[in-house]
Amino acid sequence: MLATWRRFFHPSGNDDASSPSSLYNEKCGELEINVTESSPPKATGAVKIEAVEAVGGRKGRYLLYIGLVLVMVIFELDNSTVGTYRNFATSDFKHLSVLATLNTAASIITAVSKPPIAKVSDVLGRAEAYIFTITCYILSYILCASSKTFNIYAGGYVFYSVGQAGTAILNSTVVSDISSMRWRGFVYNILYIPFLITPWVSAFIVDSVVNGIGWRWGIGMFAILMPFCASFIIVTLLVFERRAKRSSLILTEKLNLFTFCSRIDLGGIILLSGGFALVLIPITLAATTSDCWKTPWVVVLIVLGAIALACLYPYEKYFARHPVVPTHYFRTLSVMVSMALACVDNIGFGTTQTYLYVWSMVSHNFSPRNAQFLNYSNSVMQALVGMGTGLLMYRLRSYKWIGVVGAAIRMVGYGVMVRLRKNESSVAELFIVQLIQGAGSGMIETIVIVAAQISVSHAELAQVTSLILLGSFLGNGIGSAIAGAIYSNQLRDRLRLHLGHSADEATVVRLYNSITDTLPTWGTAERNAVNRAVCSPAFVCYLT
């Protein structure tokens, strides 16, 4: 039995590469990819992490994995609690109707922040980039926890989105730095083991916090927890970098402002990030308000964003010395298809998940804890299936057909969702929908990351990873905008229709903007009317 198990994980062929910088001629199915390392500047993050591995050896690698686990634990706990507190914060500020707008803006900011942070990590180093992102986290917690108005809370969420973007891209980059290509799909997903536990733990935390000390304290405690847990990997990286410098493995390089801007490709970052932001944020605002399309500045911003994106390719080809999007990416099918697939998959996710938490509390009378269970069962299943997909990729040395199976499961999930996500559905049926969707996404998300990464050199690892994650978060933002548009344009009229003449306009507005203190008692005629409004086909279509 043991011999059979060993043969499964050690198929014919050598897996002699322990890091991507030493792995060449990696075969995926019938496709052979020849990776040729370029010679990046000596102070790049890729060179620094290679020097850290050389100085630290096996012990250093284990310390980095421990640091990554600590960061992932607090990152996932934050992700599964602070994101939930957003529902209660917008309700307390009487702005529940703009929840989708806030989610979309956060997704867009998260998406467009990834390429510049990836570039900074390449120029300055992984540890220095971690310090920047954790600082953004701390500022966001302070602003959100102490906010007196919705605008201050939203401003804090901007910093939160930047911190989340940076931490996510750095975690993905570091784990790719220290793992081989064949094992990368598995190692990339195994870091999400904490996510198999944190949603269930966070459900009890959220339930206690919102019914006790309040969501502000729930956010504020991360201002201490996040830097404490992140300090391990930051200190580990800095200590080994210092040793590598003493051994002359890293050459100290002083950058002036012009050289720094050239290295991070400031012009390309402005065109890429600014272009997407100028296109998507106005579209989001226009979709979630009734008269926003009539404002001239919306069209102007969209046109400016489109022009910026159109200028990206010629700028990167003819002007950029260190392009944030190397032009050969546009001709690399595995990069472009992976980015498009990640975007499309997350459009579906954002559309069907944005108001799921609120919907379950209203239509099924879920407590905050049970709504949390439902909301994150999809992602937990995604993490589990992602690990299995990574092992399967190691065995088969191929990913194309796994991706096809994942897409098919995703489509089956949408079909099941149309049938089962209703007011009359049982709790088991609601969870079945989430699990099927998560299984499909687990395959797809693993495939797109690895397929893109094995097509580039180690020096471009952070860049290509940031672009795939950019596609993911852009898709999530677009999906949230779709959900928000339907919420804004449908729910108020549906509430008026089902509540009838017994409810005045003030009651309709309160139900539309908040769930924390305005829902009628469960089982009453008024509550049944609200449930029918929320679950009516014209409104719930975004969930299917």
Name these PLM-found stretches.
Residues 67-69, 77, 84-85, 94, ...:
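Transmembrane core module of solute transporters
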Residues 255, 449-450, 471-544:
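Hydrophobic transmembrane architecture of multi-pass small-molecule transporters
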Residues 60-117, 167-168, 172, 202, ...:
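Extracytoplasmic
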Residues 146-157, 419-434, 488-494:
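Helix-loop junctions at membrane interfaces in 12-TM secondary transporters
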Residues 113-126, 210, 385-401:
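Helix-to-loop junctions at the C-terminal end of transmembrane segments
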Residues 216-340:
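Hydrophobic transmembrane-helix bundles of small-molecule transporters
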Residues 116-267:
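Helix-loop-helix hairpins in multi-pass membrane proteins, especially solute transporters
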Residues 1-82, 91:
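Cytosolic juxtamembrane N-terminal segment immediately preceding the first transmembrane helix
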